[in-house]
Amino acid sequence: MSNDELKEDPEVSIIIPTYNRSEMLCSALGSALGQTYTNFECIVVNDGSTDDTDLELAKFSDKRIRILHQDNQGVSSARNFAIRESCGKYIALLDSDDEWLPEKLDLQLSFMKSESLDICQTNETWVRNGKQVKQSKKYRKPSGMFFEQSLETCLISPSCTMFNRKFWDSVGPFDENMPACEDYDLWIRSGFKFPVGLLEDRLTIKHGGRPDQLTNRVASFDLYRIYSIIKLLHSKELGPDELELAKSELQRKVGYFLGGCMKRGKVEQAERVEIVVEAVLNGQSVAPADVLAGQKIFRG
């Protein structure tokens, strides 16, 4: 069977959400189709793109590709849609501006099976504006159970990640109310349940530095991380130790957020968030979404 023929039961489902990134998408999709491991389906969700994404996708004739369309609803919705439509035992996420080395799926799947893992990630190479950059120690990927570290910062990159259905059924889906930090949200929900395997090889290329990236568009990432932690506290799933860690990190993140608001003269915004968080820490019943009420999502 040739590489471009879809087997009846693909073992891996590659998930690529995309919005107005036709040029980068071709590189990402090409790196997926160029894998040495071939028993996969590749689901691309066009999340309401207004550029020539469909024209670029039409250039690919590989039968393993499935193209889905939806109105623009964000990356969380697009990923969830694709995963609902997928049939692989394993799910591999790939952002449309990143790339994989050819052996990524082969080595990662073998590693997951040999170590009996439910989720693992590879190491990655960072490329910013076309040039490779050095990663700071802060973002060095750990392995095992690292819930406390995950609360502080996002240490799992979607494009590096592969997980099985057991993992997804336990902690999914991505929160579609979040235009950003949806990965942070999923990882802190899973961080006290599943150890994360780390394949040391740098098998993923993570691109950055472009103005269209959410990093450059979202008004406040801290706000969405605060929302995520409040949701986690609200879930009642945490044990005593995890509960204290989450509360401590919530207070720290709120401190950063309030300080930023004060510097920018956004006193009313700061007061609204502070009231909600104080209620949460005092054990009062608060809807997590209250912390987002009236908040500006994007800059400009």
Task: Identify the function of each model-found stretch.
Residues 84, 140-228:
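Conserved nucleotide-sugar donor-binding catalytic segment
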Residues 103-134:
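Conserved donor NDP-sugar-binding/catalytic core segment of glycosyltransferases
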Residues 1-33:
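N-proximal low-complexity "stem/linker" segments adjacent to membrane-targeting elements
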Residues 23-26, 51-59, 99, 103:
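Acidic helix N-cap motif at the loop->helix transition within catalytic regions
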Residues 91:
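Short aromatic/hydrophobic "clamp" motif used to bind/position activated sugar donors
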Residues 2-7, 208-300:
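C-terminal subregions of glycosyltransferases and related glycan-biosynthesis enzymes
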Residues 31, 38, 46-55, 73, ...:
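A conserved acidic beta->alpha catalytic loop
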